[in-house]
From Swiss-Prot:
<feature type="domain" description="Fibronectin type-III 6">
    <location>
        <begin position="460"/>
        <end position="544"/>
    </location>
</feature>
<feature type="domain" description="Fibronectin type-III 7">
    <location>
        <begin position="545"/>
        <end position="633"/>
    </location>
</feature>
<keyword id="KW-0964">Secreted</keyword>
<feature type="signal peptide">
    <location>
        <begin position="1"/>
        <end position="25"/>
    </location>
</feature>
<dbReference type="InterPro" id="IPR013783">
    <property type="entry name" value="Ig-like_fold"/>
</dbReference>
<protein>
    <recommendedName>
        <fullName>Fibronectin type III domain-containing protein 7</fullName>
    </recommendedName>
</protein>
<feature type="domain" description="Fibronectin type-III 8">
    <location>
        <begin position="631"/>
        <end position="715"/>
    </location>
</feature>
<feature type="domain" description="Fibronectin type-III 1">
    <location>
        <begin position="28"/>
        <end position="115"/>
    </location>
</feature>
<feature type="glycosylation site" description="N-linked (GlcNAc...) asparagine">
    <location>
        <position position="230"/>
    </location>
</feature>
<feature type="glycosylation site" description="N-linked (GlcNAc...) asparagine">
    <location>
        <position position="433"/>
    </location>
</feature>
<keyword id="KW-0677">Repeat</keyword>
<dbReference type="InterPro" id="IPR003961">
    <property type="entry name" value="FN3_dom"/>
</dbReference>
<feature type="domain" description="Fibronectin type-III 3">
    <location>
        <begin position="204"/>
        <end position="288"/>
    </location>
</feature>
<keyword id="KW-0732">Signal</keyword>
<dbReference type="GO" id="GO:0005576">
    <property type="term" value="C:extracellular region"/>
</dbReference>
<feature type="domain" description="Fibronectin type-III 2">
    <location>
        <begin position="116"/>
        <end position="203"/>
    </location>
</feature>
<keyword id="KW-0325">Glycoprotein</keyword>
Length: 737
């Protein structure tokens, strides 16, 4: 059962194939006939045939037994490509139309031609080209031709069965075109191969050499040669070789060695190779600079220069140039020269050898330095108590200056490259022997330099104490060891500068403002200069007295003394003094309350301003009279139907009084006549409470308000005054401020 469906399907496929063949035989185009098939290129065959009516294209097929290659073409002739060289193919063709394609035509055989040989070309000499290749399949011979690439001139052609050929008698440096192909046993040529090759150039002629002795450089020139792309110049000696390349007809070889003989050769180059080198005459360079140069100064002021002999040197010139630009020289065939020299100069010495090629290169330049000269214009720039600054003009040849200051066993030194020196840590008011030696690293110190004497400035004085005499003069005392010195004392502060001078050990100054701080210093001065200031001593002047001292009675027994603050004062002491006694207060404020004052007494008021350090200024003295004492026994009496009499008992001393009656219905005042101790007030409203105060009146007319006050009630009796009743005292008298 399983095999029956497969048999059924096979039968159906066979029936359909037969049906297709019947249909195609009825509608396909005619089968074309191949007229000829041939090969001109090793990878293709060209086919020619008779055109079939109704055919729109043709299918060419080439088969060699292993591969089948098909190509569709529009009409005859058609070419099948992609074939193998020297291979026999069977060619068929089918015509194609819209209805289908025909059966294959009768086959025709055709063989592809031989492959082109792969060429290797070179130019072994300027007039020849060597052509070589590998064997070609099915080839029995080869044909090779050579001609100029520009098509001019003759053509060289050779046939051979070998795989190489050499063409000679060619033009040097010329581009040639080489063609080659192989043929088979039937003499049919295969594909050809083409290469271009240039012959190598001939060697340059007319070589000339020019030598630059200063640059150790040789310039070589020649006549250009045909076909040369560039040129190579080589300079060879026994020990070295130098070269240069160029596309021009000249070239320079640099960095040649002195004292050397070179052989110069020039070769031309192109893509085929190089010509044989053409040699020019030998080149002798300049001699090398003399070596082992020795310089001696014997005796001083005379220089002797000697050197060793060198190869190719005919004579020598020695140059000696000083550092100021002056130059001398000597010309000799020997190996030594002598020159004059001076102190303080550096001489630069060079030796050259000469021959026909010119001057030798510059060798080592030697320098010789003579002993430096001594400074002769030494002068002090600054002289202080422990330091001396000196300066001088620079001298020739000095690289360093050594300065020594000697006083007894004390030696102070300083070294510097500058023409100046600061000698420090010296003793004050001391005479030193100062010498400046010039020094160079090569020659050392010149010990013949002369010395100078310099005295340092005086020593600083030491202030021992500062005192003040009865005339407010400041006395300053100091201690010093200087001889013949003048001393200046300076007091400096924010409020100015004050000075005094003396040749002794004390001086006086006055006029210093109060309330100031000063820094007091002393300076000694001699012909050598000024000392450093002494250590400063602070000086404080007494504080300034305040201005505007006033005294005001606060109560009958208390006085308020006030003033404006004075400069520097920290506290104040106020004293109120009379024959009875005194009252004091000490405060940091600008007012003070003094108690236990007796009324009606003359006092003296004194004020002292005291600084934070305890300095005291006695500032003010003035007299002050205390107020009249308050009256005693103040009473109110009814005086008629509408009046009140105020009565009191006067205290000691005569005084004027003023009475005041305060009520809710008004204030009533009266001033009694001098000497009276009562005062009457009329038209007083009844039915009110009154406060009564009797006040002394000062000479200035000021009414004092600190006396006690009493309270009375005044009743009404009908429309007139009734009873006057005492109610007590009021406690609102002025309190101390």
């Amino acid at each position: 059962m399983a095999g029956r469906p497969e048999k059924c399907f096979s039968l159906i496929r066979f029936t359909l194939l037969c049906l297709k063949m019947v249909i195609s035989s009825k509608t396909a185009p005619e089968i074309p006939t191949i007229d000829q098939a041939y090969s001109k290129i090793s990878n293709s065959i060209t086919v020619e045939w008779t055109t079939v009516p109704g055919a729109t294209s043709y299918l060419l097929t080439a088969e060699d037994g292993n591969t089948i290659i098909e190509t569709t073409v529009a009409n005859s002739p058609g070419t099948v490509t992609g074939l193998k060289a020297a291979t026999l193919y069977q060619i068929t063709i089918r015509s194609i139309s819209a209805s289908g394609q025909s059966q294959a035509s009768s086959p025709k055989q055709a063989k592809t031609v031989l492959a082109a040989p792969v060429l290797e070309v070179s130019s072994p000499s300027p007039d020849s080209i060597l052509v070589s290749w590998d064997a070609v399949y099915m080839a029995i011979g080869f044909s090779v031709s050579v001609m100029r690439a520009n098509g001019l001139g003759r053509i060289w052609k050779e046939n051979t069965t070998n795989t190489s050929l050499t063409f000679s008698s060619l033009d040097a440096g010329t581009l040639y075109t080489i063609k080659a192909y192989a043929w088979n046993a039937n003499g049919i040529p295969g594909d050809d191969s083409t290469r271009n090759q240039r012959t190598s150039p001939r060697a340059p002629a007319n070589i000339q050499v020019f030598f630059d002795s200063g640059a150790l450089k040789a310039s070589v020139s020649w006549t250009p040669t045909e076909g040369a792309f560039n040129y190579t110049v080589v300079a060879s000696s026994d020990s070295s070789q130098r070269s240069c390349s160029t596309t021009l007809s000249s070239c320079s070889i640099s960095s040649l060695q002195c004292g050397t003989e070179y052989l110069i050769s020039v070769s031309a180059n192109n893509d085929a190779g190089s010509s044989k080198s053409c040699s020019a005459p030998t080149l002798k360079t300049v001699a090398c600079a003399p070596g082992r140069v020795m310089i001696q100064e014997e005796p001083p002021g005379h220089l002797s220069v000697a050197w060793s002999n060198v190869e190719l040197g005919d004579y020598y010139v020695a140059f000696v140039k000083s550092d100021d630009g002056l130059e001398v020289h000597c010309n000799t065939s020997l190996t030594q020269c002598n020159f004059l020299s001076e102190c303080g100069f550096t001489y630069f010495i060079s030796v050259f050898a000469y021959n026909k090629a010119g001057q030798s290169p510059l060798g080592d330049v030697f320098n010789y330095t003579t002993a430096p000269c001594c400074p002769n214009d030494i002068s002090p720039v600054l002289v202080s108590s422990d330091r001396v600054e000196i300066a001088w003009s620079p001298v020739r040849g000095a690289e360093l200056y050594e300065t020594k200051a000697i006083a007894g066993y004390s030696i102070v030194e300083c070294n510097d490259t500058a023409p100046a020196c600061t000698l420090s840590a010296l003793d004050c008011d001391t005479k030193y022997n100062v010498t400046v030696y010039s020094f160079s690293e090569v020659r050392g110190s010149n010990l013949s330099c002369s010395s100078h004497f310099i005295t340092t400035a005086p020593c600083s004085p030491e202030i021992k104490n500062i005192s003040k005499d009865a005339f407010s003069m400041i006395n300053v005392h100091w201690r010093s060891t200087n001889e013949g010195a003048t001393y200046t004392v300076t007091a400096q502060g924010k409020k100015g500068l004050f000075q005094c001078s003396s040749t002794g050990e004390t001086c006086r100054m006055g006029g210093l403002p109060c309330g100031s701080m000063f820094s007091v210093t002393a300076v000694a001065e001699t012909q050598a200069g000024k000392s450093l200031p002494s250590y400063s001593v602070p000086l404080e002047t007494v504080p300034c007295c305040p201005a505007g001292l006033t005294a005001a009675q606060v109560t009958q027994s208390i006085i308020n003394v006030s003033w404006t603050a004075g400069a520097v004062a920290q506290t104040y002491a106020a004293v109120l003094e009379s024959y009875i006694g005194q009252s004091k207060c000490h405060t940091h404020q600008n007012h003070c309350l003094l108690g236990c004052i007796t009324c009606g007494i003359n006092y003296t008021v004194a004020l002292k301003a005291i600084s934070s350090t305890g300095l005291t200024a006695d500032c003010a003295y003035q007299s002050y009279s205390s107020s009249v004492c308050c009256p005693l026994g103040v009473k109110l009496y009814r005086l008629g139907p509408n009046g009140i009499r105020i009565y009191w008992r006067a205290s000691r001393g005569a005084a004027n009084y003023s009475t005041d009656l305060y009520g809710s219905k008004g204030i009533f005042t009266c001033a009694p006549h001098a000497g009276l101790s009562f005062c009457d007030i009329t038209n007083i409203p009844c039915g009110d409470v009154y406060t009564v105060m009797v006040s002394p009146v000062a000479e200035t007319g000021l009414k004092l308000t600190f006396c006690p006050k009493k309270i009375y009630s005044v009743t009404c009796s009908g429309s007139t005054l009734g009873m006057v009743i005492y109610r007590g005292k009021r406690n609102d008298t002025a309190s101390p401020r």
